[in-house]
Amino acid sequence: MSKNKFNLKLPPGSIEQTNDHDNHTGTETPQRKASTGATGSFGAMSLESLLKCIQELDMDDTQRKRMEIFLVQKQKIGELNADDFEKLGELGAGNGGVVNKERHKPSGLIMARKLIHLEVKPAVRNQIIRELKVLHECNSPFIVGFYGAFYRQGEISICMEYMDGGSLDLCLKKAIRIPEPILAKICSTVLKGLAYLREKHQIIHRDVKPSNILVNSRGEIKICDFGVSGQLIDSMANTFVGTRSYMSGEVPVERLTTSLYYYIEPERLNGDHYSVASDIWSLGLSLVEMAIGMYPIPPPDPNTLKKIFGSKIEGVSPSPTSRSPRSAGLPGEPRPMAIFELLDYIVNEPPPRLPPGVFTPEFVDLVDRCLKKSPSERADLTTLQNHEWIKRAEQEDVDIAGWVCKTMDITPSTPTKPSADANC
């Protein structure tokens, strides 16, 4: 088995170079297919092997049934080709690419198709496709399903499970703030997804943020866009400038674009290597943003917090060392920070905190454990999964599906319970 730069195992024979055809799909050519067996839809693993793997995972019967249905559908689809897709609309853009809602005409399935324009050499492009094949083995109720990837006319296409509720950054725009009971369920699921990637595949996400957490009308919460392809990350870092992101890839500061700064952790700016602790920082910052309804660096001042939360706010005063720039004409609201001003703030100023008196002490404690400046002091995945806030969330019956459908104005795919707003 060969390995890529993230130490991920690749299928046997995947290092073989393919011809420079414009519609390379990243799956086996007919000649190679005959020698390796019918594994085109699943990389190096058969359907039977994948079904056996999901039997070993911790999930309920409903989740297991949905996983089995997804894998069977995926086998029927087979190889993907650009001509088989019909664009239905655009879902979002960022990180150098656009995500469309598309119908796979032969099967009738609706998919999310991410298109990334890359001007790279054929060998680099083929390496990206090979590295993305690892996603065939990433099957979990907490990870967005992967149908396949291919290349055509300067674009890498990554075809994924369609989540009709969209990403949490879009939900946040509609909801203004996300209620704590919903956030607790989100956090619990994200932790399970990160633990699955780490324990089963030795993968670190590298880009935890609201736009990479997706929801649907069935109440499912799944993470996407994790750093499985080192070559793709490097190629995008070298190519794109100026789109907002929360990614913390292992690239030098001089190569970071504007998009890569917002959720970067302090130790990365000091030259340390990326680790699971980096994902924990990004998760903590995401929780604060979704809870208060605004990016928390620089932190909002007391007047802004009182406008947001009213009389719930207890005594809040700015940190004596805090430098929180304000916009002229918009009292209390942080002005956008220049990139190096933001980086300096992340490294040298206190980390964000949830405002006192608004949220439960357990939620505040979990966020504080995520946002320790020193990664050695930051809580790890196991500690967070055993945290009181998470354990309580797993016991509570919160209607995620109802909240998603109400927030995004979509039709429930299953009957919903009383709105989660009642718990907020």
Regions found by a protein language model. Name each.
Residues 154-167:
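Conserved short submotifs of the Hanks-type protein kinase catalytic core
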Residues 1-78:
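Intrinsically disordered, low-complexity regulatory segments that flank or precede the catalytic domain
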Residues 88-95, 99:
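Protein kinase glycine-rich loop
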Residues 148-149:
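A short, aromatic-enriched beta-strand patch in the conserved N-lobe beta-sheet
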Residues 186-187:
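Activation segment signature within eukaryotic-like protein kinase domains
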Residues 110, 115-138:
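Conserved N-lobe beta3->alphaC-helix segment of eukaryotic protein kinase catalytic domains
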